[in-house]
């Protein structure tokens, strides 16, 4: 049996590949998508020419390539680096945060640091950059490269994310996009053009997508800094919701999405279920397998898929129950689905502390 549900789906794909577009690919393609190899096709775009060269030098998959370029809504709209990566208001709010004060403290050292260290501090603007006067319009780039099918779109460029997302307006259906992952801001105004979560959410719901996961990153102010979650200055254990990661996908089982869901191929639906599993929302994947059992059954064994998803849900269990047994315990209203009432036991505190030490924000993509 495959080690994961995405690996199972990758084995069963016959005619389609898993096509991924990563806009803001510094650090590389997320390792979880490698489960689709050798049926993984990906294009990474990043403003750091230094990073794109590094990634290309390490890449062994001939179907994955990297483009060093800034992205824009128009090819004749050069990038003004002097204005900062984000809107003026966002920049002013960002400057109030403790991670920016740490950046200031380390500024001189970072100028001479390695590109890897600069990226660890999100100081990508200090690395060797692509030509800001020659940005690319991503949908046009896809056309030039012969990309007519795209499963997964990820955007994280620390600035004009919403502007770039809108360049795909009217193209999600023609490209066959099933999932979108974006960095979003929880600060800003009510203006419809700003890169904020509420504008992103409205736009993507209008394009036929629904929210399946939302990770919130809190940031403390420099007036009273909180402890950082990671070894580098970024989000903190407390503070205001500043940014986050939003995960949108096609909800093919929703009544108001039935028509669009009916246009997806069997392999697209299988890949969608694999995306849910990769996002650590295996319940959505299981619901899709059950709701589209007749459609998916010719492609792979549904019960095997459900067992893998049930095992994913029981990650802390040495011997996970099968899907059927797991559901039986739930239907029996087993105490296993609840935390005991009363004070938190000492063993649970120790277990939680140990888990928190090794996984400070577990499975965050």
Annotate the PLM regions.
Residues 1-365:
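Phosphate/nucleotide-binding beta-alpha loop and adjacent structural elements of enzyme active sites
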């Amino acid at each position: 049996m495959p080690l994961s549900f995405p690996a199972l789906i990758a084995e069963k794909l016959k005619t389609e590949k898993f096509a991924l577009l990563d806009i803001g690919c510094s650090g590389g393609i997320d390792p979880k998508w490698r489960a689709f190899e050798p049926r993984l096709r990906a294009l990474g775009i990043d403003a750091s020419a230094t990073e794109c060269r590094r990634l290309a030098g390490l890449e062994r998959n001939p179907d994955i390539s990297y483009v060093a370029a800034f992205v824009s809504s128009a090819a004749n709209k050069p990038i003004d680096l002097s204005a900062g990566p984000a809107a003026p208001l966002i920049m002013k709010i960002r400057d109030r945060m403790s991670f920016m004060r740490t950046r200031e403290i380390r500024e001189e050292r970072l100028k001479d640091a390695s590109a890897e260290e600069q990226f660890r501090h999100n100081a990508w603007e200090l690395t060797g950059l692509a030509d800001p006067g020659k940005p690319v319009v991503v949908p046009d780039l896809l056309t030039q490269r012969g990309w007519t099918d795209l499963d997964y779109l990820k955007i994280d460029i620390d600035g004009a994310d919403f502007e770039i997302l809108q360049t795909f307006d009217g193209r999600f259906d023609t490209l066959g996009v099933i999932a979108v992952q974006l960095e979003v801001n929880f600060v800003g105004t009510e203006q419809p053009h700003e890169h904020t979560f509420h504008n992103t959410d409205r736009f993507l719901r209008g394009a036929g997508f629904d929210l399946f996961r939302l990770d919130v990153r809190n940031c403390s102010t420099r007036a009273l800094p909180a402890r950082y979650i990671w070894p580098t200055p970024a989000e903190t254990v407390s503070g205001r919701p500043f940014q986050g990661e939003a995960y949108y996908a096609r909800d093919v089982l929703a009544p108001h999405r039935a028509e669009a869901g009916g246009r997806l191929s069997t392999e697209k639906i299988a890949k969608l279920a694999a995306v849910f599993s990769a996002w650590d929302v295996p319940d959505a994947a299981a619901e899709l397998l059950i709701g589209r059992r007749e459609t998916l059954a010719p492609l792979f064994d549904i019960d095997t898929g459900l067992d893998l998803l049930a095992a994913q849900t029981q990650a802390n269990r040495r011997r996970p129950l099968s899907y059927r047994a797991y559901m039986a315990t739930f239907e029996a209203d087993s105490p296993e689905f609840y935390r005991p009432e009363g004070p938190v036991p000492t063993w649970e505190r120790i277990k939680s502390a140990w888990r928190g030490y090794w996984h400070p924000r577990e499975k965050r993509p």
